[in-house]
């Protein structure tokens, strides 16, 4: 945990008073289960707490940032920001993936790169930070790590292209729409996916992203921007 403490101190000006709390935040259930005799705590309860404070702070930010957006739009945007895939991305940005304690089986099966484990650890860290410090420190961290990407429009950009494309294509009846990965490049922790969207077997758009879902949205956007004439 010393390396993690160094990362937190150097990059985020965070120093935990309760080191055990920090360690618990990065302990997956699989690790605790493999060391039952040691009665090690895992991070599920902290994840529960972190999820709650994250929802609150992101809701407050969006409410103040977008005074004219209706509740439905705010809810959709919040959902995009706090979804599993997004939180996993933030965890990787913070190098948290390097410090999660996993059981041998989970490690061998690729758990260190699994979005659900990374997202849970990110929320657990927020919960631990809340308990060790206060909500103001959690807010400071969120505004340093998450909000810049929100303000860059990363989450609004991907909100609805797949749905929009589906609505355009299926206005006159059902149409078979399929997304497929063309290629994957880069190391496991920083992959780039190339995806194409096909309608009735015909490729109508391509996109690239750091996850399959982001690449699919880019492919749908590409198809929408081309216009329906090229899609059918």
Swiss-Prot record:
One GO term (biological process): mRNA processing
Domain RNase III intervals: 5-134
EC annotation from Swiss-Prot or TrEMBL: 3.1.26.3
Domain of life: Bacteria
Residues the entry annotates as binding Mg(2+): 47, 120, 123
Quaternary organization: Homodimer.
UniProt protein name: Ribonuclease 3
Organism of origin: Streptococcus pneumoniae (strain Taiwan19F-14)
Taxonomic placement: Bacteria, Bacillati, Bacillota, Bacilli, Lactobacillales
Annotated gene: rnc
């Amino acid at each position: 945990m010393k390396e993690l403490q160094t990362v937190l101190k150097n990059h985020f000006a965070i120093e935990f008073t309760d080191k055990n709390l920090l360690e618990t935040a990065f302990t997956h259930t699989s690790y605790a289960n493999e060391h039952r005799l040691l009665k090690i705590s895992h991070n599920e309860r902290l994840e529960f707490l972190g999820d709650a404070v994250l929802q609150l702070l992101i809701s407050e930010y969006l409410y103040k940032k977008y005074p004219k957006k209706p509740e439905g739009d705010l809810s959709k945007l919040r959902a995009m920001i706090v979804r599993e895939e997004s939180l996993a991305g933030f965890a990787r940005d913070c190098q948290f993936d390097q410090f999660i304690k996993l059981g041998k089986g989970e490690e061998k099966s690729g758990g260190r790169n699994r979005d659900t484990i990374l997202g849970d650890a990110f929320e657990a860290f927020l919960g631990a930070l809340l308990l060790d410090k206060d909500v103001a420190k959690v807010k400071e961290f969120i505004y340093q790590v998450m909000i810049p990407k929100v303000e860059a429009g990363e989450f609004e950009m991907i909100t609805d292209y797949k749905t929009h494309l589906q609505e355009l294509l299926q206005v006159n009846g059902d149409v078979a729409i399929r997304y497929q990965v063309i290629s994957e490049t880069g190391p496991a922790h920083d992959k780039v996916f190339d995806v194409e969207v096909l309608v009735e077997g015909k490729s109508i758009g391509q996109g690239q992203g750091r996850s399959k879902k982001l690449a699919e949205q880019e492919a749908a956007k590409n198809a929408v921007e081309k216009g329906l004439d090229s899609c059918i």
